[in-house]
């Protein structure tokens, strides 16, 4: 199934992916959710990895660079809180 989105909608999705990348990176680095328990941190990372996996697989991307998203997916998959 092909998703038909406007250029603006695609840009919004890409921006949201960047937010997930930033959050995964920050949780792993210990600069986000430092006061939360391990289960909450793990849940956050897992949810954001799942979001990135779903979004990277979309067929509406054209020239967007997925390097950071793929790196965050890999880092998040290896993360254990």
Which stretches of residues belong to each language-model region?
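Beta-rich interaction/scaffold domains
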Residues: 2-81
């Amino acid at each position: 199934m092909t998703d038909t989105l406007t250029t603006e909608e695609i840009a919004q999705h890409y921006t949201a992916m960047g937010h997930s990348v930033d959050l995964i990176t920050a949780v792993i680095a210990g600069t986000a959710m430092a006061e939360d328990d391990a289960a909450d941190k793990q849940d956050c990372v897992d949810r954001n990895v799942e979001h990135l996996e779903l979004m990277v697989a979309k067929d509406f991307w054209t020239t967007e660079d997925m390097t950071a998203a793929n790196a965050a997916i890999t880092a998040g998959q290896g993360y254990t809180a």
